[in-house]
Structures are given as structure tokens and as C-alpha cells.
Amino acid sequence: MTTRQPLYKSLYFQVIVAICIGIALGHYYPQFGVAVKPLGDGFIKLIKMIIAPIIFCTVVSGIAGMQNMKSVGKTGGYALLYFEIVSTIALLVGLIVVNIVQPGNGMHIDVSTLDASKVATYVAQGADQSVVGFLLNVIPTTIVGAFATGDILQVLMFSVIFGFALHRLGAYGKPILDFIDRFAHVMFNIINMIMKLAPIGAFGAMAFTIGAYGVGSLVQLGQLMICFYITCLAFILIVLGGIARMHGFSVLKMIRYIREELLIVLGTSSSESVLPRMLIKMERLGAKKSVVGLVIPTGYSFNLDGTAIYLTMAAVFIAQATDTHMDITHQITLLVVLLLSSKGAAGVTGSGFIVLAATLSAVGHLPVAGLALILGIDRFMSEARALTNLVGNAVATIVVAKWVKELDTDVLDAELASGGRGIADTRPEDDLGVAEGPTPSNVK
């Protein structure tokens, strides 16, 4: 048994302390609180620095790493169809809830105090954007240019094309895929390093927010967080619960079955931490190896329901807080962009914030500097994101397996009825080879 990490070394605890200090500093010494704003800005710039390579590695590895494309084509098609439908529903749920509750209304954050030059650039980009221009802009002028400018949609498009081309090379392209996998490990290590600075960034961002706008602004941030948790819970029980019921099983029994994995995710804020166990458990529920091996790893990039809810709610919250007008056209544009950019997310702590930063840049209408408003509470919303993502992928695996008639329903019923008893003591590493298909180590 591993030694428990001291509380003071926990990132969760460090961020809590940093936020409390930031609130106190901003309240009692508002001028100094405003002065430490660069700490939050610097952290955001570090996050933006790795957006392009992270998305490239995740998407390319997920596509090029697929085995036996012809034999799993039907399963892959159904899986992608399910992912798109449910992800769209999740995005719409977040969009509807944040428009009804409007947690950011009344904050009246002055955008110019956040970063006037950047806001002017994004507003100009949004004003110049037509539908045709937007679609043409997805195609990069040069590959290097897409990565140099950090244009998320251009990077995503090139990554998809590169992934398919690499897959067509077969064994000849494997050295390149191996290199990308190793490069991805480096990128995710950089994420881990950057996330260690989260307390400093959260301190600077919260001190500035309270120093510039008062303690009252914290109430709105709390409303966003509570609203998000309730929305995720409702999505699991109503949307995923309804999908599960239509396919002959209970989402509550599924939650009970994967309760240990949920607890691990709750502690780590990363659904990646239970990937090997999920491969084992989904097969033991009666789904075929080929289905589990395709749906679970692919879902870690393409089926992130909790992240989808977070992205729409956070983006519109920033618009509400900064009094940035968003009409129906802007919100539809946001939805379309998120349908693409959310596929570059990964199940690691901070990935939702990374994709949010990329999305605000791609939309062009919302101030990226507004990310500073939610930096302090983003860490505390990551648990709900990760838990919702995990339940969503568990449900997706069973649903897709049933669609392609690769599910033993008798085994499913028996295992769910048992609640997973007897599995807890099994070491996941004993069965890492149970699932066939893509298990890229960098898909989080």
C-alpha cells in the first residue's frame, strides 16, 4: 500500500490556501491585489503555450493508433455517431442552463482592465468573420503557421489529416507514431509541471479579481461552480440515465459498479488514472474486447460530456461577467467551434481549461483574458468534469456494444446486479492485455 501524501503537498489543498490568501489580499490590500495580476496572466500564457502540440499528439495518436480499421469500421462509426450526439446534447445542456441561471450577470467586469490590446484583436477578428471566411480560415496557409499562431481549428484539421495519412502507412509509419507517443509524454509532463504553478496563478487571479471588483464577485464565482455541479449531476441522472434505460440497464447500477474508479477519479481529478481498470470492467460487463478496446480509449478524447458542459457554461459565464453581448448567432458559432475543439481535450487535470482557452481564441468574440475570472475555481470544477466523463464513457461502451450486437446482456445484468463484488482486489496490471484496439498512452 502506498504512503498517503501529506495534505500540504496536495495540489487541491495548495490551491485552496492560495485562493484564500488571494481573497484576503485582494480585500484588505486591493491595490497590491491588482498589482499581482501578472501571476495569473503568466499562468494562462503557459497554458496557451502547449495547446497546439497537445491537441496534435492526442488526435494523431488516437486516429493513427487504431488497429484493424476495416474490421472495426462499423464499431468506430457507431461510436463516433454516439459521441457526436451525446457531446452535442451536453454542450446544449450547458448552454441552456447558463442562459437560464445567468451566474455571471451583475459582475460588470471591465474588459479593458483585463487586457485591452488582446480584446481589441479578438473583437476585430470576430467582426471580420463571415461564414465562408470562417470555414476557409480552418484551412491553414502553412502547417508551421497553424502551430505558430496557435489557431486551434487549423491545428485540429491538420492533426486529423495527418492521423489518417499516418494510419495508411501502416508499419512503415509506426516509428513516427512511436515518436509522437513519446513526444506526447513530454507534453503531458509539461502540463504536470505547469499545473504545479496553479496555486500561484490562482492566487494572482483571485487577488486581482477581489482587489479590482470586491468580495461580491466571489459570490458569482461560487454560483457558477454550484450551478456546474448540479448540471453535471442532472446530466448523469436524466440524459445518461435515459440513454441507459433505453438500452436495458440502469445508470445508477453502473455508477455502483464503477464506484471505486469514481473515487480514484475524485481524488486525482483525472479519468486517465482508471483507464486500465475501465478496460477490464467493461469487458467483464459482457462487451466484446474489440468494442471495449476501441470505444474506451477513443472516448477519452471524443466523448467528454462533463468537459462539454463546462466549456459552454464557462464561455458564456465569461461573456456575462464582462458584459460581452452574445446573440443567437454568436452562441451557435460557439457551439459549432466547441463541437470541434472539445475533441482535442484529454482526461487530465487542467485539460478543460486548456480547451476553453483555445476555444475563446478560435471564436474571436470573447476575451481570452476573461479566463482569469474562473482560474481560481477551475481546479474545483475538474472533479465534476472527470466524474461525468467517466460515467459517460462507461455508458457509451455498453450502448455501442449493444448497437453492434457485441454485448452479452445476461452477463451485463448479472454483473450490474452483483455491484462489481470481487473485482476490487484484482490488480488491473494483471489484465492490461484484455482489450484489443487503440490504447495510446497519451490519450487521457
From Swiss-Prot:
Residue ranges of the region described as Disordered: 422-444
MF annotations from Gene Ontology: fumarate transmembrane transporter activity; malate:proton symporter activity; succinate transmembrane transporter activity
Membrane topology field: Multi-pass membrane protein
Lineage: superkingdom: Bacteria
Any one of the GO CC terms: plasma membrane
Main subcellular location of this protein, as a coarse class: membrane
Cellular compartment(s): Cell inner membrane
Cited Gene3D superfamilies: Sodium:dicarboxylate symporter
InterPro entries registered for this protein in UniProt: C4_dicarb_transport, Na-dicarboxylate_symporter, Na-dicarboxylate_symporter_CS, Na:dicarbo_symporter_sf
Cross-referenced Pfam families: SDF (PF00375)
Record-annotated membrane-spanning stretches: 15-35, 46-66, 78-98, 143-163, 199-219, 224-244, 291-311, 332-352, 354-374
UniProt KW Nucleotide-binding keyword: no
GO biological process, one term: L-aspartate transmembrane transport
Keywords: Cell inner membrane, Cell membrane, Membrane, Symport, Transmembrane, Transmembrane helix, Transport
Reported function: Responsible for the transport of dicarboxylates such as succinate, fumarate, and malate from the periplasm across the membrane.
HAMAP family: C4_dicarb_transport
Family named by the database record: Belongs to the dicarboxylate/amino acid:cation symporter (DAACS) (TC 2.A.23) family.
Protein name (database record): C4-dicarboxylate transport protein
